[in-house]
Amino acid sequence: MSRLLTIRQAEELHKSIIAYLSANNLSNAASALRGELGLSEEVFDTGTMVKYETLLEKKWTSIVRLQKKIMDLEARCGALQTELNNATPTSLSKRNQDPASWLPKVPARYSLESHRNTINCLAFHPKFSSIASGSDDCMIKIWDWELGELETTLKGHTRAVLDVDYGNTQSGVLLASCSSDLSIKIWNPLEDYKNIRTLLGHEHSVSAVRFIPGRNLLTSASRDKDLRIWDVTTGFCVKTIQGHSGWVRDVCPSFDGNYLFSAGDDVTARLWDITNISNPEAKLTMVGHDHVIECCAVAPQTSYQYLAPMAGLKKEALSKMSAVEFTATGSRDKTIKVWDRRGSCLMTLVGHDNWVRAIVFHPGGKYLLSASDDKSIRCWDLSQDGKCVKTLSDAHGRFVTCLRWAPSVVKEVAPSAESANGQTDTNDLLKSKDNQPQVQIRCVVASGGVDQKLNIFAN
C-alpha cells in the first residue's frame, strides 16, 4: 500500500484504473488487475464502472492544467519582480493609479473565442480568476481571465443560456445558470462544475438569475411574468412574486439581501421588500422609460455621496440610508435612468444610439458603465450629473449584450496595520474604520456580444 494515499484514496485509484482499462477495451488487463486486488465482480459492478471510468482522465487533465498555470504564474512573478527591480518613482505613480477612478480602455487585454453563437451573459468568480459565459449555443464556458484561457465547457441546457451568476452559499461558492429551456441549473466548481441541482417551475424562458447575499437563496426572473425565490440547498421554490404585466427581463438583489429590484417589458421597474420571504411586499414602481427595460442595477453605497445631493439629501445622512437608496435602469429607448428610493428619476443619461443592454456601477461609486447594441461601452460620471466621460466606440464588432465588473476582494484587517514605512497603505484599498475588512477593487471588466467574443479589459 502506498504511504502517500489513504486506504480510501488507494481504493478509488484502483477502481479508476480498472474502469479506464475496461472502457478502452483492455478487458484482460482489467480482469487481471481486479484479480490481483481481490475485487469481485459483485463489488465492481456496472454502476461502479460508470462512476469511475472517466475519473482517471479528469484527474490527469486537471494536473496538466494546474502545472501549466503554475508555470505561467511563475513566469508572471518573474516579470513582476524584474519590473519592481527596475521601478522608478514615475513608473510607480502610473501603476498605482487609484482603482476608484480606473476605467476600461481599448484594446481589450484578451478577446476570447470559443462560443458558436451570441454570448448573452457573464459572471466572475468572487475569489478566483474564473469567469463564466453563457450563450445561444446552449453552453456555458469557464475561462481564466488572468491567463486568457478556456478551462472547461458545461453542457446541460437544451436551449439558449440567458444568465449566469456565482454566489456564496452554505455549500460554498456555486454557479447558477438559467435558460430558454425553462430551467435553472446549479453547478459546483469544487466538483469539476458538476450539475448538482436543476430547478423547475417557471412556465417560460428564465431570463435572469441571481444569488441573494447572505440568505442561501436564489432569485429568478422569467418571461412568464413572475419572479421566483428558491432555496439553494433543497432546490424548492419558496415564493413566487407576481406584479409585472409582461416579461421580467432582469432582477437584482440588494447588497443586504432584503430587497429585489426588477424590470421588464411592461416598461416599469419595481422594488420588492423580501425581508419576510413568506410575505414579500411591493414597495415601489418606477415609471418613465418609453420602451422595454432590458437591465437594472442597485447602486453600491460608495455611490451615495455622488447621488445624495441630487436627491436633496445631506451627506450627514449617508450612514442612515437604505441598501436600495439609489437604482438604475437601461432601456430599449436608448437611455439609462437613475432613480431614488421615492421613485423619482434623478437623471436620464442620453448618448447611446441603440438599445441599452447592460449596466454596472463602478465599485468605487463614481461611475456607471453601460453596454449597447450600438457596439459601444460608455462610462458616465455620477459626480458630473451623469456626463459621459469615456466611450469605447468599438468594444465589439456587433451588439454588446452583457457587461460585468469583477467583484471586489474582501481582506481581513489586522489591528493597526501599517506599511513598511510606518504609514497606512491606502493605495488600492477602500478601508473602513474599527478594523473592519478591507475591500480591494479589482480593475477588471468583461463584456460579451453577438460577435461571439468575450472581451477582458484589465489594468
Curated annotation (Swiss-Prot):
Domain of life per record: Eukaryota
Pfam entry (one): WD40
Domain LisH: 9-41
Tagged with keyword Cytoplasm: yes
GO molecular function, one term: dynein complex binding
Coiled coil recorded as keyword: yes
Localization in the cell: Cytoplasm, Cytoskeleton; Cytoplasm, Cytoskeleton, Spindle pole
InterPro entries linked to this entry: Dynein_regulator_LIS1, G-protein_beta_WD-40_rep, LIS1_N, LisH, PAC1-like_LisH-like_dom, WD40/YVTN_repeat-like_dom_sf, WD40_repeat_CS, WD40_repeat_dom_sf
GO cellular component: cytoplasm; microtubule; microtubule associated complex; spindle pole; transferase complex
Family to which the UniProt record says this protein belongs: Belongs to the WD repeat LIS1/nudF family.
Domain notes from UniProt: Dimerization mediated by the LisH domain may be required to activate dynein.
Subunit structure of this chain's protein: Self-associates. Interacts with nudE and dynein.
HAMAP family listed in its UniProt record: lis1
Name the UniProt record assigns to this protein: Nuclear distribution protein nudF 1
The organism of origin for this protein: Talaromyces marneffei (strain ATCC 18224 / CBS 334.59 / QM 7333)
